[in-house]
């Protein structure tokens, strides 16, 4: 059902956020974690979200609308060390505003690069979400780069570090935009948001 998602808006200012009247699923994570590639894999559209090898290239909130039923939201990545403090503060302020005030936000998907695992900047973001009672799902990206045993080790390590997190929604899904692994499971989780809307629980507790 997500194959008809199309880019409809790129927003750099909180006052310009669109109102689609549909549930939104937002993708967050460190710079270069593979958000755009994963959105393209989920929507089966290789040219949908612009993919860049340069970290921090997404400086705006990008919206992809699926036939007026669901919107996927690509949030700017955090943790890019080469971004100026002023620039980083500007777009992270936009992300914070979106996460705290967006009534249409139904699910936040936090992406973790399986090759490097959870970093302190990820844990800081998770703590921020926990403190503000924002529900989120964890998705491991780029699992095609790992052997099966390596992936299991990474998954166990991640599960151990987030044990006790109250806002975390399960299951933790391993994905690969390149091989397609885990994409079907992720699409299933995302699609459930349409069925749950508007009677389902909001992303904020």
Curated annotation (Swiss-Prot):
Any one Gene Ontology MF annotation carried by this entry is:
metal ion binding
Matching entries from PANTHER family are given as: ENGB-TYPE G DOMAIN-CONTAINING PROTEIN, MSS1/TRME-RELATED GTP-BINDING PROTEIN
Question: HAMAP family in the record, alphabetically?
Answer: GTPase_EngB
**Ranges of residues in domain EngB-type G:** 21-196
Write down what this protein is called. Probable GTP-binding protein EngB
Q: Which InterPro entries does this chain map to? A: G_ENGB_dom, GTP-bd, GTP-bd_ribosome_bio_YsxC, P-loop_NTPase
Q: Tell me the residue numbers annotated for binding Mg(2+).
A: 36, 58
What does the similarity note say?
Answer: Belongs to the TRAFAC class TrmE-Era-EngA-EngB-Septin-like GTPase superfamily. EngB GTPase family.
Question: From which organism does this entry originate?
Answer: Anaplasma marginale (strain Florida)
């Amino acid at each position: 059902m997500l194959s008809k998602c199309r880019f409809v808006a790129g927003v750099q200012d909180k006052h310009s956020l669109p109102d689609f009247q549909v549930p939104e699923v937002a993708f967050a994570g460190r710079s270069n974690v593979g958000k755009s590639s994963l959105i393209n894999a989920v929507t089966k559209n290789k040219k949908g979200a612009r993919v860049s090898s340069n970290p921090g290239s997404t400086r705006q909130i990008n919206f992809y609308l699926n036939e007026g039923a669901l919107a996927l939201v690509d949030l700017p990545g955090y943790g890019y060390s080469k971004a100026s403090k002023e620039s980083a503060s500007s777009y992270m302020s936009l992300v914070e505003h979106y996460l705290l005030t967006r009534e249409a936000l139904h699910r936040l998907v936090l992406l973790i690069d399986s090759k490097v695992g959870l970093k302190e900047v990820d844990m800081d973001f998770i703590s921020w979400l926990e403190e503000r009672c924002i529900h989120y799902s964890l998705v491991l990206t780029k699992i095609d780069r790992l052997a099966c045993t390596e992936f299991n080790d990474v998954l166990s390590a991640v599960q151990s570090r987030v044990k006790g997190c109250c806002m975390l929604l399960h299951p933790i899904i391993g994905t690969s935009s390149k091989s397609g692994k885990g994409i079907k499971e992720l699409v299933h989780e995302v699609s459930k948001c349409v069925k749950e809307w508007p009677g389902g629980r909001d992303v904020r507790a």
